[in-house]
Amino acid sequence: PKMSYGDVPLGNEFFMAANGLLTEQGVNPVDISVFEWEGMPAFFATSSKSQLPFDFFAAACYLMSRYEEYIPYAPDDLGRFTPEQSLAFTHNFLDLPLIDMWFDRFVAAWTDFFELPPFKPPVNTTELVVEIPQLYAYKYKTLFRSFFEGLYDFGRLKFTRTFDRLMVVLRFREDPLIGLIEHMEAFRSTAVSFRFFALYTALGVHDKSLSVFSKKHQQELKSLSDYAPTAPLASFESTQKSQTLNQDINRFSGLIHRPIKAIRQHKLVLRFPDTYRAFSSSGIKHDYSMQYPDSPGFRASTAHPFRFFDLGEEQQTPLTIHPICLSESHIRAQQYARKMRQLFIGYQSRLQKLNAPMLVALTNETFNNRSKNATFLATL
């Protein structure tokens, strides 16, 4: 099979017209006109001689590289790019794995052109990414920290939480977050896989990890890592200092006695390309942070893992990005069980049709023994 990609076809080969983005130097604002093609959005329109009426490669690169996040934007209070500023949100395709849908059409055109047998797609999988910003709600904290956190809750009129904390500290009750492994056993009999990302860093304004010096905390995290793949939740502080990121990674590696190859960014503070450059420089091979904190959908418009392309260096990196389409906060925001289930099943069926993986992010708070989580867990 012969294919060409450029301005004009060379002969009777499979021709894909280029719009020029992939040959440009640097990152510059791009004027994008979105149109409808076969019932889905497309952009970077090309000549009628092309097998697809748009530059599939340039459009996919624009979305997957997060080109628009290199352009100056108005950050939220944590310095994050907001979904409302994205092309996907503006043109109502944030909830679509658009690149995967395009690729499905591209493969169909390819096999039809060369009269090839149907392409055998990969098997659809579901994986839970369980974030652990704090292993326990009240256990293993110093009396000083317990006192001031309790005082803070009391000042905000959270009397139930204040009383619950007191009962746990006095050992009249178990911590509400105890028994994570027992809860995860329910998924062992299903086709769902899972992995943990635990915050294990110095206490900070946005990082509420239990003490890294607590022997019991260390033992619990080690037990988790023996049960399922476990990696660090990179601290918020590490987004400002690469030295802190390396300390977090080395500390976690020393704890579980394994090299660290995967990571997730706490608070999902991603700054392109700095965050992913720092991960790559620290030896990280897999990132699980590609999502928006407050909006469900596909931040990079794909559900499939992909190698991150650094636009600043104009090269592909060894870092593989694993996109997440839903998180606990997205599902809970629906409030009612029916709407929760509709949201979950909507994404699930969409990805099953494309044989694409589905990654859902939870926190260990999902399995809080004192919360009314039965409806939410039933959705999963």
For each feature predicted by the language model, list its residue ranges.
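Metal-dependent polysaccharide deacetylase catalytic core of the NodB/CE4 family, i.e.
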Residues: 134, 138, 158-162, 185-270, ...
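Short acidic/histidine-rich active-site segments
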Residues: 232-233, 289-291, 360-365
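Catalytic domains of cell-wall/extracellular-matrix polysaccharide-remodeling enzymes
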Residues: 1, 237-315, 369-373
